[in-house]
Amino acid sequence: MSASAVFILDVKGKPLISRNYKGDVPMTEIDHFMPLLMQREEEGVLAPLLSHGRVHFLWIKHSNLYLVATTLKNANASLVYSFLYKTVEVFCEYFKELEEESIRDNFVIVYDLLDELMDFGFPQTTDSKILQEYITQQGNKLETGKSRVPPTVTNAVSWRSEGIKYKKNEVFIDVIESVNLLVNANGSVLLSEIVGTIKLKVFLSGMPELRLGLNDRVLFELTGRSKNKSVELEDVKFHQCVRLSRFDNDRTISFIPPDGDFELMSYRLSTQVKPLIWIESVIEKFSHSRVEIMVKAKGQFKKQSVANGVEISVPVPSDADSPRFKTSVGSAKYVPEKNVVIWSIKSFPGGKEYLMRAHFGLPSVETEEVEGRPPIGVKFEIPYFTVSGIQVRYMKIIEKSGYQALPWVRYITQSGDYQLRTS
């Protein structure tokens, strides 16, 4: 997840500035970067990530400079690239134009900025307004030590101000998972993934430190100790308040939170999910006469759970008219501007099976049908339930005044892009 070192190279690949953050990659490895880049250019397969043995180079180009991060691990590439672009943005605010000459003329400031921007390979202070409060440019010299260190730095957080007070200290935690599903007309699952977020609503006084623990199914997989019944999270992204260095060491999610609402983390699971609401449909079209539609919906989740606000959208021909419906539960309505029937079920318990029949008339002169038929779409929300099994095991709230705070946890599984194709 972290970068080992960061280099700034000139147009010929010669290092102008380098900062070794972790010491696990020899600094001489950068000598392989430019030959690899030129080789890829000749082959016409240029990529933003190059590899030499076990070392990976993640790079961007700005003006006549290359910014390169090296790593040995399976790093969070999006985080590293975001850091490189943010570094360019910060340098441009300091030097107006970022090019070889501005790096050479201000190398002292560049080194100081690199020390503040990243710590042990993890992005740290990337807010240019905070950096400019205590790393100031006067000519080519760095002015330090005279002015007081700004409050945002002593607090080590730019996202939370001091002096926040609440009569009642509470934290609300929402674990929300969206299920993306695509099933073909034969009933085979083509795409199945879970996109999850953990959102917090924080009403806490002072400058508290929070520690969030997830259940062992998650932690064991992340630390490589589990072999089965585990949840392998992909594309894990944290809010900037999370201490990434600690998470990298022991998987503890430790942070000083912003005040109010924010997204603590997001993740993705590319795993075969059993469709929570399974749809079987028969659509029969009788030429110049009518369309008969039969849709069967089954809840394939635990019986003690209930899906709320279920909406099943069934496509119908654009020239259909005179709709008639019969449902075993809920209600159906025709939405002609979208060419769909929407079957609404307020409460859908797990293990239950329901039926909807629809009858439409067709004109005697048929309109030309567009190739392919839109899929059936399903919307739903299941409270107190996560598909992955992720759970919040504990939330510790530590604040110097020692007040007691109440954490509240809510779990929600909902439909994302949930589609089933029809034949």
Swiss-Prot record:
Domain MHD as annotated: residue spans: 168-421
A GO CC term assigned to this protein in UniProt: trans-Golgi network
Cell compartments where the protein resides: Golgi apparatus; Cytoplasmic vesicle, Clathrin-coated vesicle membrane
The entry's keywords: Cytoplasmic vesicle, Golgi apparatus, Membrane, Phosphoprotein, Protein transport, Transport
Gene3D superfamilies the UniProt entry points to: 3.30.450.60, Mu homology domain, subdomain B (2.60.40.1170)
Membrane topology category: Peripheral membrane protein
Post-translational modification summary for this protein: Phosphorylation of membrane-bound AP1M1/AP1M2 increases its affinity for sorting signals.
Keyword Cell division attributed: no
PROSITE patterns: CLAT_ADAPTOR_M_1, CLAT_ADAPTOR_M_2, MHD
One record GO biological process: vesicle-mediated transport
Pfam families per record: Adap_comp_sub, Clat_adaptor_s
Family statement drawn from the similarity comment of this UniProt entry: Belongs to the adaptor complexes medium subunit family.
Function summary: Subunit of clathrin-associated adaptor protein complex 1 that plays a role in protein sorting in the trans-Golgi network (TGN) and endosomes. The AP complexes mediate the recruitment of clathrin to membranes and the recognition of sorting signals within the cytosolic tails of transmembrane cargo molecules.
Assembly and interaction partners: Adaptor protein complex 1 (AP-1) is a heterotetramer composed of two large adaptins (gamma-type subunit AP1G1 and beta-type subunit AP1B1), a medium adaptin (mu-type subunit AP1M1 or AP1M2) and a small adaptin (sigma-type subunit AP1S1 or AP1S2 or AP1S3). Interacts with P2X4.
Protein name (record): AP-1 complex subunit mu-2
Gene name, Swiss-Prot/TrEMBL: Ap1m2
